[in-house]
Amino acid sequence: YYTPDYDTKDTDILAAFRMTPQPGVPPEEAGAAGAAESSTGTWTTVWTDGLTSLDRYKGRCHDIEPVAGEVNQYIAYVAYPLDLFEEGSVTNMFTSIVGNVFGFKALRALRLEDLRIPPAYSKTFIGPPHGIQVERDKLNKYGRPLLGCTIKPKLGLSAKNYGRAVYECLRGGLDFTKDDENVNSQPFMRWRDRFLFVAEALFKAQAETGEIKGHYLNATAGTCEEMLKRAIFARELGAPIVMHDYLTGGFTANTSLAFYCRDNGLLLHIHRAMHAVIDRQRNHGIHFRVLAKALRMSGGDHIHAGTVVGKLEGEREVTLGFVDLLRDDYIEKDRSRGIYFTQDWVSMPGVLPVASGGIHVWHMPALTEIFGDDSVLQFGGGTLGHPWGNAPGAVANRVALEACVQARNE
């Protein structure tokens, strides 16, 4: 399974793994074992190998390079033939590529750094339900980032007070407010009550400001059926957008919801709760840029992508790398930004990156410069923490944004 002379095909799915072999295990052996375990191999030779063409179906570790400045760490490049994967299933792709190999004895640690998805495969996915351009047309908002706000305290408000907070923020000038990812349907606020009060707030703010407003109604639930029930109710109320936690909810549920949203004209906001469990470690897990690519294939119109400046972790160049992977059609390989492969999305719509987490109005110049127009800037405490209240907090954010955009345009 270690084939250094292999030339990759345009249809191969390419993976870059950062591997730390156990002491005494040569990197070639570790790379080959990983390629085997995540494709056709098993721990021994079996009779039934003779009944198929392993040359056609096996994953190949075709290049290994040491990581600069690290002891006993290597980047292993593995190519997988397209036939190993079910079309249109992120779930199956991850089950194959990262399903078993991370528990391997020969490896002390393993991290999936990047994936190259060939157009032949990405074309089998729904992708974002609408994409950036359609969203701007639906909202009739152009030439500036969109503003959001997560309603806090995240848990404990009654539905009516929650609706009031939503109204104040939207009335003050925000484009969106957001259910916190933990808000599903708890005893103090059942989902249907929340949806009803929020819809009222939405239409009242819309009527008073003459702008289209949205609130990310969190449809995440314990079962797929319940999730779709909530999305359907949101659509019946006339809400423009719903929300889903794609890692805790799972890719299967997420893709089902994306299909529903596309068919019914709902935008889909994606929250990445649980991502740090998977991507925080430097040498083990899956890098967020892979999770971001997976989301673009599975379907979502917004996704949280770190801030570069707030309370949560994120390095600037690397963050910008996966922001481009979310928005652009064609992204060149660039190792300085952690992009191991050139990625061609052909015509798959883009996803709006959402900057959220510990940012406030003083960060606005930096945020508009870093993220550009196609983004959503979300201030939770940065709106509701205003000493004069929610609406003035929203006004402050909107004024700051307009000022930054005007300064840039002049």
From Swiss-Prot:
Substrate binds at residues 100, 150, 154, 272, 304, 356. Binds 1 Mg(2+) ion per subunit. Keywords: Calvin cycle, Carbon dioxide fixation, Chloroplast, Disulfide bond, Lyase, Magnesium, Metal-binding, Monooxygenase, Oxidoreductase, Photorespiration, Photosynthesis, Plastid. It comes from the Eukaryota. The active site is at residues 152, 271. The modification N6-carboxylysine is found at residue 178. One of its GO terms (molecular function) is magnesium ion binding. One of its GO terms (biological process) is photorespiration. Its EC number is 4.1.1.39. InterPro entries: RuBisCO (IPR033966), RuBisCo_large_chain_AS (IPR020878), RuBisCO_lsu_C (IPR000685), RuBisCO_lsu_C_sf (IPR036376), RuBisCO_lsu_fd_N (IPR017443), RuBisCO_lsu_N_sf (IPR036422). Its main location: plastid. The disulfide bond which can form in the large chain dimeric partners within the hexadecamer appears to be associated with oxidative stress and protein turnover. It catalyses: 2 (2R)-3-phosphoglycerate + 2 H(+) = D-ribulose 1,5-bisphosphate + CO2 + H2O; D-ribulose 1,5-bisphosphate + O2 = 2-phosphoglycolate + (2R)-3-phosphoglycerate + 2 H(+). Coiled coil: none annotated. GO terms for cellular component: chloroplast. Heterohexadecamer of 8 large chains and 8 small chains; disulfide-linked. The disulfide link is formed within the large subunit homodimers. The basic functional RuBisCO is composed of a large chain homodimer in a 'head-to-tail' conformation. In form I RuBisCO this homodimer is arranged in a barrel-like tetramer with the small subunits forming a tetrameric 'cap' on each end of the 'barrel'. This is Ribulose bisphosphate carboxylase large chain. It comes from Gleichenia japonica. The lineage of its organism: Eukaryota, Viridiplantae, Streptophyta, Embryophyta, Tracheophyta. The gene is rbcL.
